[in-house]
Amino acid sequence: MHGTMHDMRTAARSLVRAPRFTAVALLTLSVAIAVNAAMFTFVTAVFLRPLPYASPEQLRDVNIDALEGRAFVAPRIRQVTGVLAPQGGVAPYTERGFVVSQTGPAAEGPPIFVPGAGADDRLFGVLGVIPALGRAFTAADIVPGAAPTVVLSDRFWRVSLASGPAVIGSTIRIEGREHLVIGIMAPRFAFPDFAEIWVAQPMADARFGETRVLFRGRAGNAETAAQALEAALGASGSEAHVRMTDLLPRGGALLAALLGAICFVLLIACSNVANLVLARGTGRRQEIALRAALGASRGALVRYLSMEGLLIALGASVLGTLGSVWMGDLIVAAIPSDGLPVWFEMQLDPSVLGYIGALTAITVLISAALPAFTVTRGRLATVMNEAGSRSTGDRSSTRLRASFVGAQVALAMVLITGAALLLRAFRSMNDVDPGYAADSVVELRARHAGLPGGDDFLRAALDRLSGVAGITAVAATAAGPAGRAVPTSDAERAVAPVTLAVSAGFFEALGLPLVAGEAFEPGREQVGVAVISESAADLMFGGASSAIGATFAFDGDSAELTWRVIGVARDRRRPSIGGRGIERQRYVYVPITAALAGEVQLLARVDRADPLSTASASMAALRDLDPDVVLRTPRMMGDVERDLAGNVRFFASVFTAFGAVALGLAALGIWGVVSYTVSRRTREIGLRIALGATPTRVVREVAVDMLRPATIGLACGSLGGIAMGRLLRGVLFAVGAADPASLVFVVLVFGGVTLLSAWLPARRAARIDPLAALRSG
C-alpha cells in the first residue's frame, strides 16, 4: 500500500510537470466519457428503466390487426374482455384529447386542449396504481346517468391548477360538461404515455379502432391469451390477427447500434490517449532502465507507469460525469417537448454510475496498462541501449502505435458509414413526392367544447379564413369512422382504408388532383357519395374507371346505407422505412356533414412567402369568430410529412455527431503519431537529407509507415460499416445496408483526411535542416 501511494504521488507530480500532455489526455477522455454517460442515461430512461406501474413486465397492449385478411370492425369490447378476463386482468381505454375550460383559480382564460384517456373502473387496477390524492374510478362512476368524474395527472394539477389543495371535490369543465375531480395521480404516472387527465367513460359501446385494450397476464400466458382471443373472434365470423406487445419500447438492433456508436467513440479516445502515453513512455525509457537497474521489478514498473493513466482516467470520470449532465440536457432539449412521455426522467442512478465505473476501468486498461506493459518489455541491456539513442523505441511499441491508429480508423469508418447511410435515407425520405402541394398548405387544428364539426361553425370558420390575405383556398377535414372495412374485388378479402370527412374544396386546397370523376360540389347537399384514392379503387373495383358510379358499404352498416363513388383522387404517398419503399395510402373521402368530428383540421392554401404569418392571421380570425375555440400551433403540411422521418433524423444526427468526433480524433491520432515519429527521427532524417534524399522521398517514406495501418483500418472499417448498416435497416429508406455510393464516399473522405493528417507532419520532416539535426543528435 505504501508503494502504491508513493507511486500515485510521484505520478501526480509527473503529470503536473507535463501540463500539455495532461490537459490533452484529460480533455479527450472527459469528452468521450461524458458522451457515453449521457447517451447511456438517455437509453436507460427510455428503454431500460421500469415503467411506473406494478410489475410492468406483465402488461401487454392488445392489438387487433384489421388491415389484412377479413377486417375486424364490430364493436365487441365485451367479447374481448370476456375472453381475456379468465387469463388475467383486462381494461379497455380510449386514447384521445379533451377540451378543458375553467381550470384557473379565477376560471379565466381560454379553453385548452389536454391529452388524456377515457377509462372505466378497471384501468387503474390493471395497472396496479392508486391516486396519490383522492380515489380512482369505481363501478358507480361508470353506470348510465352517473355524474361525470375525472382523475388528474400531477403535472396538470400543478401547472394548470396551481397545486390547489381543495381540488378534490371541485369541478372543471370538460367538453362542455362539469366533471367532478375525484383523484390526482403520482408525479411520474402516465398512461397512455402523454395522458394528463382520465375521464370516466363506459366502454360497452366503443368500437375497435377507437378503443385499445390493456391486458395483465400471468407468467408466460400472453401467447395463450392471444390464441384464445383469435379463436373466439374467428368463431364469431371476424377473422383477425391478435398481437400482444410490451408497453416498454424496445430498441433491438437500433439500440445495439446506438450503444455501439458511443462505445466506439470511447475506444477511439482511449486509443488516442494510449498513443500519447506510449510515446511519453518511450521517451522515458532511460528513466525506466535506471529504475530497473536499481532493482525495480517489471510489475513495479508497470504499476508506476499505470498510475498516471489511472489518475487521468479518474479525473476524466469525474469531469465526464459532470459533463454528462449538461450533455443530457442538450439531448432532451433537441427532442420536441411532446416527444417524451411524462415518466421520462434523466437521472444518474446506480446503473449509470456503474456504467461510468466500467468505462473508467476500460480506459485505464487501454490507455495506461497496455502501453505500460509494452514499454517495459525487453531485456535491461536492450532498454539501456535504446534509452541512450534517439530511436522511436522497440518494434513492439511501433507495432502497438500502428495498431492503435488502424483501430481508430476502423472504428471511425464504421460510425461515418452509419452516418452516411442515415443521411442518405433522410434525404431520400424528404425527396418523396407526397402527391399534393404539401409545402403550400397550412394546417390549423380546431377544437371546441361544443360541436366543432357542426355546419354553423365550419361555414363561419371557412368564410373567415377565405377573407385572410394570402389564402387562395380553404377546406376542412375530420376523422371519419375508425377501423371501418370495405369489400374488395376479391370476395374473400376486405380492407380498412383511412376514412376522412372533408368539405367541398378539399382537393383544391390540398392540391390533390382527381384522376377520374368529380369532387364534392360547394353549396350542394350531398349524401351517400364518396371520393376514393387510386389504390383504394384498385383494390375495391379493379381500377379508377370501374370505380366511378360503383357503390360500396362499410362493414357493420345496414344494407340500405351505401356509398356511391363519384370521383377517384391521386394517391397520397409517404415513405415506409425499413426497406418497404413508398406507401400508397388508401383513402375514402366522404362529405364532412356525414361524420361527427371531434377535432377539425382546417387547411389553407397560401401563396405568400411567409406562410406562418398567414397562419397567425388565420388564428386571430378564428379566435375573433369564437373565443372558446381551441387552436393548436399551425404547421405546414410539408413539415407534418417530414415528421415521418423523425426517427431517421434523430439517428442521423447522433451518428453524424459521433462520426465527426471520431473522424477528428482519428485524424488527430494519425497526426500525433507521425509528428512523434518525426521528432524522434530528426537526426536520421537530417542524415538522409544530407546524403541526397529528396524532400518528396522523405515525405513519402515518413507518411507511408503510417498509411499502411490506416489502409488496413479502412478495409476493416468498410466491413464494419456494412455490419452497422444491417443493424440500422429498421430506419433506412431507399438505401441498402451495403450502399456502394455511401461506402465509396466514406472511403474517399476518410482516405483524404488520413493523407492530410500524415502529410502535414511529414512535410515538416522534409524541411529539416541537416546540419541542425546532426548537431542536435
Regions found by a protein language model. Name each.
Residues A269-A313, G669-A710, L714, R764, ...:
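Interfacial "coupling" helices/loops that link adjacent transmembrane helices in transporter permeases
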Residues M39-F42, A274, L310-V383, R424, ...:
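Small-residue-rich transmembrane alpha-helices
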Residues A18-V46, P50, I268-S271, A313-S317, ...:
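Short, strongly hydrophobic transmembrane alpha-helices
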Residues V31-Q58, M327-I335, L411-S440, S675, ...:
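Alpha-helical transmembrane segments
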Residues M1-V24, P52-A54, D65, G145, ...:
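Membrane-helix entry/capping segments
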Residues L48-V99, R212-R216, M429-P487:
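Membrane-proximal extracellular/periplasmic loop immediately following the first transmembrane helix
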Residues M1-A23, R243-L248, L276-R303, M307, ...:
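Alpha-helical transmembrane segments of integral membrane proteins
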